[in-house]
Regions:
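A short beta-strand segment in extracellular, disulfide-stabilized domains
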Residues: 48-65
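Solvent-exposed loop segments of extracellular immunoglobulin-like
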Residues: 63-73
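Blade-level signature of beta-propeller repeat domains, shared across WD40, Kelch, NHL, RCC1
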Residues: 439-478
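An edge-strand/N-cap motif at the start of beta-rich repeat modules
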Residues: 115-145
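Bacterial Sec-dependent N-terminal signal peptides
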Residues: 1-49, 106-120, 126
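Surface-exposed, flexible coil segments in extracellular/virion-facing regions
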Residues: 73-91
Length: 478
């Protein structure tokens, strides 16, 4: 019995050796058909793309022996997203995700891990509000040299369940109350709906329904509460960020003036002389020709009307800040006298001490000659740093120095595009020498174009022709 067990123990190592030899022969011997898998070139450790870009990977799989059918399985964040040999994955979600490729051929299985970093798509660049096929769209145009890509419409892509049918009414960019989260506001239709979007993902956060037609939507000069200023049927309203109801500012203005108002689609803030605080902002009442003021950080009382009686019978063409926002400039039209006028104004200083109050003063005024090119349809933008007033006529751009004492231009500074194009909006980028100009062609499928003009060198930096629908407004996110 003991001998029997000894023979058995001695036989076990021989059986094991024989078993190992069979695996080795079958895998690597000349007559074996098992084929090991590998990649001819390693995958990247991490792939970085913008949201909505497509991750494309085409691995070259090598087999050691028989060329068998290879199965593929691509995983992103633990989910199988493709079983094709080449990966084409649309990066819909923002963030960093673990990824894995599994390849198998029946004999061998290999795993290859890599990372995917999806960045925000919409950062520095222009946001272009336009109409296209009966709907409001917002096109994103990144800065020159950016790795980001142009997108014709960021609204529908990121909010597929929302119907943006209707005319575009207004757009602007602001930081949320945390001073970090970027927000984009867009007004659509009549009666108008104001949408608040997350500026990074372009997902809708809040909607506000107005009772009338929004014709103006811009970031308010108010520091508290942080808000948007909007004109609803030419009456000013305040929309506090991330809230859904409009506060009518027109009631108190109407009570202060003693009559109805019809405000122009413009507002301009001014600062005290040391530039530390924003004293207030002004609007213009086209109903009777009045410069309407609202308090921001002034410690004293700001009159509801500045320079009473000075602008009777006039309507606003455009306004803006000069002297680094210490003063303002107005361009007006008087239909009775058929005259355009330019006013250079100090809006006043309103501290709590009555003896230190400085009333508003017209520092200079001049009749704008017919040869200067100004029209009632001119788009007007003002450089607070350069004291230059830029205004349009068709596709022509004019420039007037407020400090020149009435020395208006006799010819256009430059023109944009073809003769049939019309300047729809302009934007001066704060702290830079860039003037962005948006034009619309008379006809075509995509009529909207964008031009970038150097205000220092007075030359065109670049042009993007016919890239979007009919443009209403533009804004910039920095």
């Amino acid at each position: 019995m003991i001998k029997k067990y000894l023979y058995l123990l001695l036989a076990l190592p021989l059986v094991a050796l024989s078993f190992q030899s069979c695996i080795k022969d079958d895998s690597y011997g000349p007559s074996g058909n098992s084929s090991k898998l590998s990649l001819a070139q390693d995958l990247q450790e991490k792939y970085t793309l913008n949201r909505w870009d497509t991750l494309k990977i085409s691995p070259n799989v090598v087999q050691t022996n028989e060329q068998k059918k290879v199965d593929y399985e691509w995983e992103v964040n633990g989910k199988v997203v493709s079983t094709d040999a080449s990966l084409k994955y649309v990066c819909k979600d923002f963030g960093s995700f673990p990824c894995r490729l599994k390849v198998s051929n029946g004999d061998n299985i290999q795993y290859y891990e890599f990372g995917l970093n999806v960045q925000y798509s919409y950062v520095d660049g222009l946001y272009i509000l336009a109409s296209n096929s009966g709907k409001t769209i917002v096109s994103y145009l990144p800065e020159e040299g950016s790795t980001k890509t142009f997108d014709l419409d960021v609204l529908q892509k990121n909010n597929p369940s929302i119907d943006f049918t209707g005319e575009p009414k207004g757009i602007d960019y602001a930081l949320a109350r945390d001073n970090k989260t970027p927000l984009l506001f867009v007004a659509v239709g009549n009666p108008s709906t104001i949408y608040e979007f997350d500026g990074n993902l372009m997902n809708m956060r809040f909607t506000t329904n107005s009772t009338g037609d929004v014709t103006y939507l811009r970031k308010s000069a108010l520091t508290y509460p942080k808000s948007m200023l909007t004109m609803v049927n030419h009456v000013p309203n305040r929309l506090t960020l991330s809230e859904t109801s409009l506060f009518n500012l027109g009631r108190s203005i109407k009570d202060g003036l003693g009559s109805d108002i019809s405000l122009a689609d413009a507002a301009t803030a001014w600062k005290q002389q040391d530039l530390r605080y924003v004293q207030g902002y002004v609007m213009f009442d086209n109903a009777e020709g009045r410069l309407v003021a609202q308090k921001v950080q002034a410690t004293g009382k700001v009159p509801v009307e500045l320079l009473k009686g000075k602008f009777t019978g006039e309507t606003l063409v455009g306004m803006g800040p000069v002297d680094n926002e210490r003063n303002i400039v107005l361009l007006t039209w008087n239909a009775t006298s058929s005259k355009f006028k330019c006013y250079y104004i100090f809006p006043g200083f309103y501290p709590s001490t009555a003896t230190k109050v400085e009333a508003a003063v017209v520092k200079d005024e001049a009749v704008v000659p017919a040869t200067a090119g100004l029209t009632t349809q001119s788009v007007v933008r003002v450089s607070a740093e350069k004291n230059l007033v830029y205004y349009s006529a068709g596709n022509k751009l004019y420039a007037y120095n407020v400090l020149s004492g009435g020395n208006f231009p006799q010819s256009a500074l430059t023109t944009f595009g073809d003769a049939g194009e019309t300047i729809a909006d302009m934007l001066i980028l704060e702290g830079s020498n860039k003037l962005y100009v948006a034009t619309n062609a008379a006809s075509g499928q995509l009529v909207g174009s964008i031009y970038c003009f150097d205000m220092n060198e007075n030359k065109l930096l670049w042009a993007k022709k016919n890239i979007t629908g009919r443009i209403k407004n533009i804004t910039y996110r920095q």
